Design a protein with these regions (language model features):
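Single conserved hydrophobic/aromatic residue that forms the stacking wall/gate
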Residues: 138-147
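Intrinsically disordered, low-complexity regulatory segments
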Residues: 1-139
Length: 147
């Protein structure tokens, strides 16, 4: 089984149609030896300054250069501070399940730095060790499947 991950659901649906992954599931499409899942923008972000021991953050605190940067699920405002976005947590769980069932991953996020970052943050956050290849060009079967 091969996983494909896109930056947004609309692209995932287009790719799934092209490769014959027509079975709809919660958070992904499957079929014909493929599982196609998606992010919806930046699901993972760098931790806030407080996570690195910087209290009462001010401009004078910059730059913040911790020994290791922490990746966390996208945050939303809560009553007191911020909390992980429940929709993001759900999709991350589904992406992990897809990755766990597959032998390799084809990255079909948008071309450029942002698309690359969206995938790599997810990949590292999930501690995934599967091999992956990047397909950034056109929505044609040979380029999607890296044939």
């Amino acid at each position: 089984m091969i996983a494909l991950i896109t930056e947004k659901p609309s692209v995932a649906k287009d790719i799934a149609r092209i490769i014959g992954a027509t079975q709809r599931n919660d958070g992904y499409l499957s079929g014909n030896g493929y599982m196609v899942t998606w992010a919806f923008g930046h699901l993972i972000q760098l931790a806030m300054p407080e996570a690195y021991g910087v209290a009462n953050f001010r401009r004078e605190s910059l730059p913040i250069l911790p020994p290791d940067f922490q990746l966390i699920p996208r945050q939303v405002k809560a009553e007191k501070g911020y909390k992980a976005d429940p929709g993001v947590l759900k999709q991350l769980k589904l992406i992990k399940e897809v990755f766990d069932q597959c032998d390799r991953i084809i990255v079909a996020t948008d071309a450029g730095r942002e698309g690359e970052l969206i995938f790599r943050y997810i990949f590292h956050y999930l501690n995934c060790r599967k091999p992956f290849a990047v397909s950034y060009t056109h929505l044609t079967l040979p380029t999607i499947l890296l044939v």
